[in-house]
Amino acid sequence: MAARRGALIVLEGVDRAGKSTQSRKLVEALCAAGHRAELLRFPERSTEIGKLLSSYLQKKSDVEDHSVHLLFSANRWEQVPLIKEKLSQGVTLVVDRYAFSGVAFTGAKENFSLDWCKQPDVGLPKPDLVLFLQLQLADAAKRGAFGHERYENGAFQERALRCFHQLMKDTTLNWKMVDASKSIEAVHEDIRVLSEDAIRTATEKPLGELWK
């Protein structure tokens, strides 16, 4: 009998919303509860494409905006065989940023439509759950200054947030808003409950394709 597939769970949100912390805590909690769970993070900086992106994000190199958008998408596509293999083996994948960040951060630049931004990622594995960690940008800034990488400034984050809200109107995706202004443990508990439900539901349906 084939293993029940794992769930694909994505955490999204503005910088400083707590995605990385909550992603780690979720994997730990799921494993402690007897699930097989692993963490993925995008961009995946260890690949050749990922190294290019890391250099770009650290402002060590410049890449034309359309080109870098396609590189971010390629960085996701090169992980698709691994994603599909893990899910088919019954491993739940918790993903810190996915295509939605890619679309929102390019869409926040001038003269990019969300429709154009989405096209390279059409057909990626479709998440069973997309958790959006909702936090006012003023509250995010109180958690420490935004970092020094490209895109890490308040004005840009504001434009990206508007793009995220446009993406969340898509009813074909299982978006769940999480109040990230609460304590780390309270946010974790909200995420854990939603994720356990997604894992149960995922076993009953095949893996979908994003934006198709």
Swiss-Prot record:
Keywords: Acetylation, ATP-binding, Disease variant, Intellectual disability, Kinase, Neurodegeneration, Nucleotide biosynthesis, Nucleotide-binding, Transferase. Changing D128N: In CONPM; loss of catalytic activity in patient fibroblasts. Its EC number is 2.7.4.9. The modification N-acetylalanine is found at A2. GO terms for cellular component: cytoplasm; cytosol; mitochondrion; nucleus. CDD domains: TMPK. ATP binds at R16, A17, G18, K19, S20, T21, R97, K182, R192. Pathway: Pyrimidine metabolism; dTTP biosynthesis. Residues 133-157 are annotated as: LID. GO terms for molecular function: ATP binding; dTMP kinase activity; nucleoside diphosphate kinase activity. Its cofactor is Mg(2+). PROSITE patterns: THYMIDYLATE_KINASE. Pfam families: Thymidylate_kin (PF02223). It catalyses: dTMP + ATP = dTDP + ADP. The keyword Lipid metabolism does not apply. The modification N6-acetyllysine is found at K169. Catalyzes the phosphorylation of thymidine monophosphate (dTMP) to thymidine diphosphate (dTDP), the immediate precursor for the DNA building block dTTP, with ATP as the preferred phosphoryl donor in the presence of Mg(2+). Homodimer. It is linked to Neurodegeneration, childhood-onset, with progressive microcephaly: An autosomal recessive disorder characterized by global developmental delay apparent from infancy. Most severely affected individuals have severe and progressive microcephaly, early-onset seizures, lack of visual tracking, and almost no developmental milestones, resulting in early death. Less severely affected individuals have a small head circumference and severely impaired intellectual development with poor speech and motor delay. Belongs to the thymidylate kinase family. This is Thymidylate kinase. It comes from Homo sapiens.
